[in-house]
């Protein structure tokens, strides 16, 4: 996200949550909202991976997110599903996040002829640079799938990316 923001001249700041659980992401967003209250126009996006979170608990957190005025960006089972869409259109059901990550790892390594582990790919800070040439494909792949929030897989990451792409660089 930050790579795209930099390319478009938008200040995107990814903040660490107290953990990756949906509850912790929401709690962190509420605290950041207080910090940015008097800083002008700030839109807070909460990026959620469903991972192993209970369905009802996950739905409740998403409702609270919307009620607080945050934009929710959801990936089921995980963020790596969005990354996978840069390589292929798939609505293959995944048993869990690990299977999705391994599928992304395989596609990434095949494309770039590398031998990254899942852990190394998750830590990669310049992944936008690697995938930016496939961004339009990822958006088209996500748009073409029958994606519903309670499906696995699901992502609405392309909606935030589409908004960012509409911004013009301001001088």
Question: Language-model segments: what does each one mean?
Answer:
Residues 2-16, 23, 30-45, 50-171:
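C-terminal accessory helical subdomains adjacent to catalytic cores in phosphodiester-
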């Amino acid at each position: 996200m930050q790579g795209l923001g930099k390319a478009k001249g938008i200040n995107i700041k990814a903040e660490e949550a107290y953990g990756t659980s949906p509850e912790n992401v929401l709690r962190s967003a509420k605290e950041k909202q207080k910090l940015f209250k008097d800083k002008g126009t700030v839109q807070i996006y909460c990026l959620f991976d469903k991972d192993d979170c209970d369905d009802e608990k996950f739905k409740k957190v998403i409702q609270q997110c919307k009620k607080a005025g945050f934009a929710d960006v959801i990936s089921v089972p995980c963020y790596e599903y969005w990354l996978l869409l840069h390589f292929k259109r798939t609505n293959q059901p995944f048993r869990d996040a690990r299977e999705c990550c391994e599928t992304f790892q395989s596609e990434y390594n095949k494309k770039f002829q590398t031998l990254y582990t899942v852990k190394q790919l998750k830590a990669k800070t310049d992944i936008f640079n690697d995938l930016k040439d496939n961004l339009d494909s990822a958006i088209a792949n996500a748009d073409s799938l029958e994606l519903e929030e309670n499906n696995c897989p699901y992502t609405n990451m392309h909606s935030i990316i589409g908004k960012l792409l509409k911004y013009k660089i301001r001088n």
